Amino acid sequence: MENTQVLLNIVWTMVGAFLVYFMQAGFAMVETGFTRAKNSGNILMKNMMDFVLGSIFFFIIGFALMFGGSNAFIGTAGFFHPKSLADADGMFNGLPIGVFMIFQTVFCATSATIVSGAMAERTKFISYLIYSAAISIFIYPITGHWIWGGGWLSQIGFHDFAGSTAVHMVGGLCALAGAKMVGPRIGKYTKEGKPVAIPGHNLPLGALGVFILWFGFNCGSTTAATYNLGDIAMTTNLAAAAATLVTLIVTWVRYGKPDISMTMNGALAGLVAITASCDVVNDYDFLLYTSPSPRDR
């Protein structure tokens, strides 16, 4: 029975890893659909390369910094040979270490790719490659160690089930810093400072990306085939649906008509917000996560 449960956990974790991996395509579609056609190639290349660089550097250095020991601030073992962290049976955190590593690798890549959308259409490709290497080597692994690797945040009871902080906030803060450095897109604001809408060239593609992103993270983060998978999926779905509805209503009232791009971004906001606590919130608690604040376009 124990071996059967381990096999089920392996299969489910790999399914979760592939779902999160496919989120790379979702992010690429959202970013490409919401930007101008002339920049599509650049955006697709950035999304591809942050996964490629993340896979290599997280394997060589990042995994060790994140899970290599119980130091409160940084991992100290497993550099260049992360499989050395496994026990005598090749297991790590209840899974074969290769399974656990690929699951964590796709999380690292997701954190990296968040920045691409925030700096779309105004970032040099070489600069983005340098950033992708940096977040995969030390930014994401070190902060991830604090939360999931036995670091100081986990020691004081910090709870982040699937990455609201470890993945999305880390990527979001990097995106904020990058957006501050490069500034707004040319033509985004008038001389008086009034924002000007820059419509995306392919809204159906953006919508498809949103749906691909819907369930990717949370259910797989159990890394086990457990009875609460349905509860996690339901809470995730309700939070995203409620955030979408709230955003639709707010934008409709504010702008006089529904706004598809803002509404789809509202869905993403709900998904990000529920990620940390989707395994512990009760029925209707998801309503607390449904108040994104639309800004002027």
Residue ranges and their predicted role:
Residues 1-291, 295:
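Hydrophobic alpha-helical transmembrane bundles of multi-pass membrane proteins
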